[in-house]
Amino acid sequence: MRNITLFFLLGICCITSFAQETNQRLKISHVCGDFYVYITYQSYNGQKMSANGMYVVTNEGVVLFDTPWDTTQFQPLLDSIYVRHHKKVIVCIATHSHEDRTAGLSYYKKFGIKTYTTKQTDEICKDRNEPQAQYTIDKDSVFTVGQYSFQTYYAGAGHTPDNIVIWFPKEKILYGGCLIKSIEATDLGNLTDANVEAWPITIKHIQQTCKNPRYIITGHQDWTSTKSLEHTLKLLEEYKKK
Protein backbone atom coordinates (compact mmCIF):
# COMPACT_ATOMS: atom_id res chain seq x y z
CA MET A 1 0.00 0.00 0.00
CA ARG A 2 2.87 2.33 0.86
CA ASN A 3 4.49 1.67 -2.54
CA ILE A 4 1.22 2.39 -4.34
CA THR A 5 0.80 5.66 -2.44
CA LEU A 6 4.38 6.70 -3.20
CA PHE A 7 3.92 5.90 -6.90
CA PHE A 8 0.69 7.92 -6.94
CA LEU A 9 2.35 10.94 -5.32
CA LEU A 10 5.28 10.78 -7.73
CA GLY A 11 2.83 10.67 -10.62
CA ILE A 12 1.03 13.75 -9.34
CA CYS A 13 4.34 15.60 -8.95
CA CYS A 14 5.37 14.73 -12.51
CA ILE A 15 2.03 15.90 -13.92
CA THR A 16 2.20 19.14 -11.92
CA SER A 17 5.78 19.78 -13.06
CA PHE A 18 4.83 19.16 -16.69
CA ALA A 19 1.82 21.49 -16.43
CA GLN A 20 3.97 24.26 -14.97
CA GLU A 21 6.53 23.84 -17.74
CA THR A 22 3.98 23.89 -20.56
CA ASN A 23 2.10 26.88 -19.09
CA GLN A 24 5.26 28.83 -18.31
CA ARG A 25 5.01 32.46 -19.41
CA LEU A 26 8.47 33.55 -18.30
CA LYS A 27 11.64 31.53 -18.70
CA ILE A 28 15.15 32.52 -17.61
CA SER A 29 18.21 30.76 -19.03
CA HIS A 30 21.87 31.17 -18.10
CA VAL A 31 24.18 32.28 -20.91
CA CYS A 32 27.52 32.51 -19.09
CA GLY A 33 28.94 34.26 -16.05
CA ASP A 34 26.58 37.08 -15.06
CA PHE A 35 24.60 36.98 -18.32
CA TYR A 36 21.06 35.62 -18.69
CA VAL A 37 18.39 35.42 -21.37
CA TYR A 38 14.77 35.84 -20.37
CA ILE A 39 11.98 34.64 -22.63
CA THR A 40 8.32 35.66 -22.79
CA TYR A 41 5.66 34.69 -25.30
CA GLN A 42 2.90 36.16 -27.45
CA SER A 43 0.71 35.05 -30.31
CA TYR A 44 2.01 35.93 -33.78
CA ASN A 45 0.13 34.90 -36.93
CA GLY A 46 -1.91 32.48 -34.85
CA GLN A 47 1.10 30.74 -33.32
CA LYS A 48 2.91 31.03 -30.01
CA MET A 49 6.16 32.94 -30.52
CA SER A 50 8.97 33.48 -28.05
CA ALA A 51 10.69 36.83 -27.54
CA ASN A 52 14.19 36.94 -26.09
CA GLY A 53 15.56 39.65 -23.85
CA MET A 54 18.80 39.68 -21.89
CA TYR A 55 20.11 40.95 -18.60
CA VAL A 56 23.49 41.18 -16.90
CA VAL A 57 24.06 41.19 -13.15
CA THR A 58 26.59 43.84 -12.11
CA ASN A 59 28.00 44.97 -8.77
CA GLU A 60 25.67 47.97 -8.88
CA GLY A 61 22.51 46.22 -10.00
CA VAL A 62 20.96 44.53 -13.01
CA VAL A 63 20.97 45.93 -16.55
CA LEU A 64 18.00 44.81 -18.64
CA PHE A 65 17.97 44.77 -22.43
CA ASP A 66 14.43 45.16 -23.82
CA THR A 67 11.21 44.55 -21.92
CA PRO A 68 8.91 41.52 -21.94
CA TRP A 69 6.58 41.11 -24.90
CA ASP A 70 3.94 39.63 -22.61
CA THR A 71 2.63 42.61 -20.63
CA THR A 72 1.65 40.38 -17.71
CA GLN A 73 5.32 39.57 -17.12
CA PHE A 74 6.71 43.05 -16.39
CA GLN A 75 6.58 42.56 -12.62
CA PRO A 76 7.25 38.79 -12.56
CA LEU A 77 10.52 39.46 -14.39
CA LEU A 78 11.62 42.00 -11.77
CA ASP A 79 10.57 39.64 -8.99
CA SER A 80 12.34 36.65 -10.53
CA ILE A 81 15.56 38.59 -10.98
CA TYR A 82 15.50 39.81 -7.38
CA VAL A 83 14.77 36.36 -5.95
CA ARG A 84 17.50 34.77 -8.04
CA HIS A 85 20.24 37.40 -7.67
CA HIS A 86 19.18 39.59 -4.69
CA LYS A 87 19.67 42.66 -6.86
CA LYS A 88 17.27 45.13 -8.43
CA VAL A 89 17.05 46.18 -12.06
CA ILE A 90 18.53 49.68 -12.32
CA VAL A 91 18.82 50.21 -16.09
CA CYS A 92 16.71 49.13 -19.08
CA ILE A 93 17.68 49.73 -22.71
CA ALA A 94 15.22 49.02 -25.54
CA THR A 95 16.79 48.16 -28.88
CA HIS A 96 14.03 49.34 -31.23
CA SER A 97 10.51 50.73 -31.32
CA HIS A 98 8.34 47.60 -31.59
CA GLU A 99 6.21 46.50 -28.64
CA ASP A 100 8.21 43.31 -28.02
CA ARG A 101 11.05 45.64 -26.98
CA THR A 102 9.40 48.77 -25.54
CA ALA A 103 6.08 47.67 -24.03
CA GLY A 104 7.33 47.82 -20.44
CA LEU A 105 9.20 51.14 -20.55
CA SER A 106 6.47 53.17 -18.82
CA TYR A 107 5.98 50.46 -16.20
CA TYR A 108 9.67 50.28 -15.35
CA LYS A 109 10.02 54.07 -15.16
CA LYS A 110 7.55 54.05 -12.26
CA PHE A 111 10.00 51.97 -10.22
CA GLY A 112 12.90 54.36 -10.70
CA ILE A 113 14.57 52.16 -13.31
CA LYS A 114 16.51 54.33 -15.75
CA THR A 115 15.10 53.56 -19.19
CA TYR A 116 16.90 54.37 -22.44
CA THR A 117 16.31 54.31 -26.18
CA THR A 118 18.03 56.04 -29.06
CA LYS A 119 16.66 59.40 -30.16
CA GLN A 120 15.34 57.80 -33.35
CA THR A 121 13.47 55.12 -31.41
CA ASP A 122 12.05 57.79 -29.09
CA GLU A 123 10.74 59.80 -32.03
CA ILE A 124 9.03 56.75 -33.52
CA CYS A 125 7.46 55.81 -30.18
CA LYS A 126 6.25 59.39 -29.70
CA ASP A 127 4.70 59.52 -33.19
CA ARG A 128 2.88 56.24 -32.55
CA ASN A 129 1.81 57.17 -29.03
CA GLU A 130 3.67 54.19 -27.60
CA PRO A 131 5.71 53.90 -24.37
CA GLN A 132 8.80 56.11 -24.31
CA ALA A 133 12.00 55.86 -22.31
CA GLN A 134 13.02 58.41 -19.72
CA TYR A 135 16.35 59.11 -21.42
CA THR A 136 17.58 59.16 -25.01
CA ILE A 137 21.07 58.24 -26.17
CA ASP A 138 23.14 58.54 -29.31
CA LYS A 139 23.02 55.48 -31.52
CA ASP A 140 26.62 54.63 -30.69
CA SER A 141 27.15 54.99 -26.95
CA VAL A 142 29.29 53.34 -24.29
CA PHE A 143 27.90 52.35 -20.89
CA THR A 144 29.85 51.25 -17.85
CA VAL A 145 27.76 49.75 -15.06
CA GLY A 146 29.62 48.11 -12.22
CA GLN A 147 32.33 45.85 -13.61
CA TYR A 148 30.89 45.68 -17.15
CA SER A 149 31.23 47.96 -20.16
CA PHE A 150 29.18 47.62 -23.31
CA GLN A 151 28.39 49.52 -26.50
CA THR A 152 25.13 50.36 -28.19
CA TYR A 153 25.81 50.14 -31.91
CA TYR A 154 23.71 51.29 -34.84
CA ALA A 155 24.93 49.46 -37.93
CA GLY A 156 22.07 50.60 -40.17
CA ALA A 157 18.45 49.85 -40.96
CA GLY A 158 17.12 46.31 -41.20
CA HIS A 159 14.21 44.87 -39.25
CA THR A 160 13.35 48.49 -38.42
CA PRO A 161 14.97 51.82 -39.30
CA ASP A 162 16.10 52.30 -35.69
CA ASN A 163 17.34 48.86 -34.60
CA ILE A 164 20.53 48.80 -32.53
CA VAL A 165 22.60 45.95 -31.14
CA ILE A 166 24.43 45.66 -27.82
CA TRP A 167 28.07 44.55 -27.85
CA PHE A 168 30.17 43.46 -24.89
CA PRO A 169 33.66 43.59 -26.47
CA LYS A 170 35.53 41.97 -23.59
CA GLU A 171 33.06 39.11 -23.07
CA LYS A 172 32.33 38.83 -26.84
CA ILE A 173 28.57 38.78 -26.26
CA LEU A 174 26.37 40.23 -29.00
CA TYR A 175 22.77 41.03 -28.19
CA GLY A 176 21.21 41.42 -31.61
CA GLY A 177 17.51 41.72 -30.92
CA CYS A 178 15.18 41.34 -33.88
CA LEU A 179 17.80 42.52 -36.35
CA ILE A 180 19.42 39.08 -36.17
CA LYS A 181 17.31 36.04 -37.04
CA SER A 182 17.53 32.75 -35.19
CA ILE A 183 18.73 29.67 -37.03
CA GLU A 184 15.23 28.34 -36.33
CA ALA A 185 13.68 31.14 -38.40
CA THR A 186 12.38 30.13 -41.82
CA ASP A 187 11.59 33.68 -42.94
CA LEU A 188 12.29 37.30 -42.02
CA GLY A 189 9.24 37.65 -39.81
CA ASN A 190 7.52 41.01 -39.38
CA LEU A 191 8.52 43.27 -42.28
CA THR A 192 6.14 46.15 -41.55
CA ASP A 193 8.98 48.59 -40.88
CA ALA A 194 11.81 46.65 -42.52
CA ASN A 195 14.35 47.80 -45.07
CA VAL A 196 15.35 44.58 -46.81
CA GLU A 197 17.74 46.38 -49.15
CA ALA A 198 19.79 47.86 -46.33
CA TRP A 199 19.52 44.85 -44.02
CA PRO A 200 22.34 42.73 -45.55
CA ILE A 201 24.71 45.70 -45.47
CA THR A 202 23.81 46.28 -41.83
CA ILE A 203 24.54 42.65 -40.94
CA LYS A 204 27.91 42.84 -42.67
CA HIS A 205 28.75 45.99 -40.70
CA ILE A 206 28.00 44.07 -37.51
CA GLN A 207 30.24 41.21 -38.61
CA GLN A 208 33.07 43.67 -39.21
CA THR A 209 32.62 45.53 -35.92
CA CYS A 210 31.57 42.80 -33.49
CA LYS A 211 34.15 40.20 -34.40
CA ASN A 212 34.17 36.58 -33.24
CA PRO A 213 31.22 36.71 -30.83
CA ARG A 214 31.05 33.84 -28.35
CA TYR A 215 27.30 34.26 -27.99
CA ILE A 216 24.71 35.89 -30.24
CA ILE A 217 21.33 36.56 -28.66
CA THR A 218 18.59 36.78 -31.26
CA GLY A 219 15.26 38.53 -30.77
CA HIS A 220 13.14 35.41 -31.16
CA GLN A 221 13.38 31.62 -31.08
CA ASP A 222 16.60 29.69 -30.40
CA TRP A 223 19.56 31.87 -29.44
CA THR A 224 22.24 29.24 -28.83
CA SER A 225 23.92 29.24 -32.26
CA THR A 226 26.76 31.52 -33.34
CA LYS A 227 25.69 31.09 -36.98
CA SER A 228 22.67 33.40 -36.78
CA LEU A 229 24.33 36.30 -38.61
CA GLU A 230 25.10 34.05 -41.57
CA HIS A 231 21.59 32.61 -41.37
CA THR A 232 20.09 36.11 -41.47
CA LEU A 233 22.03 36.84 -44.66
CA LYS A 234 20.78 33.57 -46.13
CA LEU A 235 17.16 34.46 -45.38
CA LEU A 236 17.64 37.87 -46.97
CA GLU A 237 19.08 36.27 -50.11
CA GLU A 238 16.13 33.89 -50.30
CA TYR A 239 13.70 36.78 -49.87
CA LYS A 240 15.26 38.68 -52.78
CA LYS A 241 14.82 35.67 -55.06
CA LYS A 242 11.07 35.51 -54.54
For each feature predicted by the language model, list its residue ranges.
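Bacterial Sec-dependent N-terminal signal peptides
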Residues: 1-22
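Divalent metal-coordination and catalytic microenvironments
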Residues: 34, 56, 66, 81, ...
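Structural recognition of the beta-strand scaffold that forms the well-ordered cores
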Residues: 37-39, 55, 63-65, 90-94, ...
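Active-site metal-binding motif and surrounding structural segment of the metallo-beta-lactamase
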Residues: 59-61, 72-116
